[in-house]
Amino acid sequence: MHYYAYVFIAAAALPGSTAFAQVSAGGDAAKGEQVFKQCMTCHRIGPDAKNLVGPALTGVIGRQSGTAPGFAYSTLNKAAGENGLVWSDDLIFQYLPDPNAFLKKFLTDKGKPELATGSTKMAFKLGDEQQRKDVIAYLNKFSDKK
């Protein structure tokens, strides 16, 4: 592969790049509500949502990782939050295909590879790009983000 192709791929992977800026703009909240039904085994969302196997996701966008009140997070999630992980559309988009790999890479990139151990409680992976955009649009309906 040519050097410039690597540079383009690397730039596209950066949070805040045009590729990630399109995340919330390309999602359909109504379709995201349908996708979210897969998440309801572990999560709830809405004004009366309670923690289950996973934390309630009301207000997740803009929240520091590992800080939903009353939820017992994994050490990996808490470490990511303590080292600056605040959930945004872009970061959730990157997280959903492989939560463990994302958190470990986040901590390693922050210079904390010694904290990138263990695993998150989230075993589910959502790889489909459009479904991720849709579910993020749905999450935004329950966010204070303006």
PLM features per residue range, with description:
Residues Q131-K146:
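Thiol-/selenol-based redox modules, centered on thioredoxin-like
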Residues M1-V7:
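Bacterial N-terminal signal peptides that target proteins for export
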